[in-house]
Regions:
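N-terminal glycine-rich anion-binding loops that anchor highly charged ligand groups
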Residues: 10-28, 259-266
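Generic beta-sheet signal
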Residues: 34, 61, 108, 128-129, ...
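Conserved active-site-proximal phosphate/metal-binding subdomains
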Residues: 144-158, 164-302
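Alpha/beta enzyme core
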Residues: 15-26, 52, 66-157, 166-175, ...
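Glycine-rich, proline-tolerant flexible connector loops at the mouths of alpha/beta enzymes
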Residues: 31-43, 130-136
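Glycine-rich nucleotide/cofactor/substrate-binding loop typically near the N-terminus or early
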Residues: 38-82, 229
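Short, small-residue-biased leader/transition segments that mark boundaries at the very start
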Residues: 1-4
């Protein structure tokens, strides 16, 4: 079927590896391996592993600022990965190679201008991600970004940012989207390999518990509030330099995801963390979102 119509799992660095991606695809979604800052060898190993865990399509997210982006781009083509999502940069130079490998390319965009540019480059779809999302974010909310991107391009638009249940799923379609991508909800699943402390912090989070750090650096990041974000925001308000701020967050995501240090690490999560109330299986999450979403869409205004 149409890959955009599946619930897509966000390709989150350090979080989205073969186990999670395969579990999502096996559950009827589209699993994504997040290359993040990893090297090409790791990405290739994860692709090979995912293929042993699922016979369903899955994708890879490539951060184009990764020093090994060129090598990773070749790896996904070599293994005929079904879908590539991209962030932080322009995938134009890889398009021909990817198209020849039969890959569908879906860049993540945070503005109308970016969406138009990606369509011109030959993207098959775009993922319009609102500022509600976790990790690196743009400025515009999903609610206003999605319909504007839908109006601006002639390719399918996937909505992302703030979606965690069937209500968000249904709303995305009402805004003109052809599919949804969820990140935070999938981090808090049984099959996700992040540390239990990380999952617990997402489940415990309330509506106001995310903070955006790094606005002054031009690279804002949404995390769950903790000791690290408090220190960072204090330094930032005092006009601290880039070097000092970067030192604070260096290896922060690894600290939280792998070591489970959710006080001093970077617990990246979206505002939808407030909607996540339990840790369930990928299958349960996807089924629940689909069932609730379809009920709402068929009900209309009644």
């Amino acid at each position: 079927g149409d890959v955009y119509k599946r619930q897509i799992q966000g390709g989150m660095a350090w979080v989205a590896e073969a186990n999670l991606a395969a579990a999502v695809s096996n559950a009827g979604g589209l699993g994504i391996i997040g290359a993040g800052g990893a090297d090409a060898k790791w990405v290739e190993d994860q692709i090979i592993k995912a293929k042993t865990l699922t016979d369903k399509p899955f994708g890879v997210n490539i951060m184009l600022m990764n020093p090994q982006a060129d090598e990773i781009a070749k790896v996904v083509a070599k293994h005929n990965v079904k879908v590539v999502t991209t962030g932080a940069g322009n995938p134009g130079k890889y398009m021909e190679m990817w198209k020849n490998a039969g890959i569908k390319v879906m860049p993540v965009v945070a503005s109308v201008a970016m969406a138009r540019m990606m369509e011109r480059c030959g993207a098959d779809a775009v993922i319009a991600e609102g500022t509600e999302a976790g990790g690196h974010i743009g400025e515009i909310t999903t609610m206003v970004l999605v319909p504007q991107v839908v109006d601006a391009v002639n390719i399918p638009v996937v909505a992302a940012g703030g979606i965690a249940d069937g209500r968000g799923f249904a709303a995305a379609f009402m805004l003109g989207a052809s599919g949804v991508q969820m990140g935070t909800s999938f981090v808090a699943t049984k099959e996700s390999t992040v540390h239990d402390n990380y999952k617990a912090k997402i489940v415990k989070a309330k509506d106001i518990d995310t903070k955006v750090t790094g606005r002054s650096t031009g690279h804002p990041v949404r995390n769950l509030r903790n000791k690290q974000t408090n220190t960072y925001l204090k330094l930032e308000s005092e006009g601290a330099g880039l070097e000092q701020l970067e030192k604070l967050t260096l290896g922060g995501l690894r600290k939280a995801v792998v070591d489970g240090d959710v006080d001093n690490g970077s617990v990246m999560a979206g505002q939808s963390a407030g909607l996540v109330k339990e840790i369930c299986s990928c299958k349960d999450l996807i089924t629940k979102v689909m069932t609730q979403g379809e009920q709402l869409l068929s009900k209309g205004f009644d």
